[in-house]
Amino acid sequence: MAKRLDLKDVNIYYGAFHAVADVSLAVQPRSVTAFIGPSGCGKSTVLRTLNRMHEVIPGARVEGSVLLDGEDIYGPGVDPVGVRKTIGMVFQRPNPFPTMSIRDNVVAGLKLQGVRNKKTLDEVAERSLRGANLWNEVKDRLDKPGGGLSGGQQQRLCIARAIAVQPDVLLMDEPCSALDPISTLAIEDLIATLKLDYTIVIVTHNMQQAARVSDQTAFFNLEATGKPGRLIEIDDTEKIFSNPRQKATEDYISGRFG
């Protein structure tokens, strides 16, 4: 299920603006990679190129290669919708369909694919909610609106929705930034479990979170305002936080800037 991601000489543009320059990195299957860096450095932009989500912005384009187990997701004839099924996304703020039931929130993607068998949908809903560590909290109110859950529960519901379509990769764009510490801990524990089955890439501004949940960390930075963001360093998380190779990395994680 989990697959490897490789970026090779990736440059990202929005119209004439060069947003991110010359990114090359590898993300191993069944691991967590954290993207860190100051605001505006391009880390979320890079994350969104991993499933072509940035293409919803007019004028966006990518040069270079983004490979999923060796297959270029930007290759000729590759369907972006299929890419987004294979590489799921969990956003910064929980975004369940507020009036849709908890069950229907989870299986919304399957219904869009034409799955109508109730037994199948119920089985997927339970499996996905269990996978998101939410089943025991909602099993007696599956027909209640998803918008009635707490913030942390809503984010786990969104994770259940993402894994219901059985992706190979999960992208998480600051999934805990809108949550309280207890809900954040629940999401972090869930990430540790999910990486047994999925390749995970997470963007976070929280240095402690990156250190806790990730196997490797990539640090992005800007040379100056108006210049493209760049990958400064990527390494095992322990090395990034204890003995980074680049001074800019050390300055950022020690709080000297950012």
Swiss-Prot record:
Enzyme nomenclature, EC number: 7.3.2.1
Reaction equation(s) it catalyzes: phosphate(out) + ATP + H2O = ADP + 2 phosphate(in) + H(+)
Record's bilayer topology term: Peripheral membrane protein
Chief site of localization: membrane
Pfam families tied to this protein: ABC_tran
Keyword annotations from UniProtKB, A to Z: ATP-binding, Cell membrane, Membrane, Nucleotide-binding, Phosphate transport, Translocase, Transport
InterPro entries to which the protein is assigned, alphabetical: AAA+_ATPase, ABC_transporter-like_ATP-bd, ABC_transporter-like_CS, P-loop_NTPase, PstB-like
Root EC class: translocase
Domain ABC transporter: 5-247
Subcellular location: Cell membrane
SUPFAM superfamilies: P-loop containing nucleoside triphosphate hydrolases (SSF52540)
Entry's Gene Ontology cellular component terms: plasma membrane
Assembly and interaction partners: The complex is composed of two ATP-binding proteins (PstB), two transmembrane proteins (PstC and PstA) and a solute-binding protein (PstS).
Protein purpose: Part of the ABC transporter complex PstSACB involved in phosphate import. Responsible for energy coupling to the transport system.
Full protein name: Phosphate import ATP-binding protein PstB
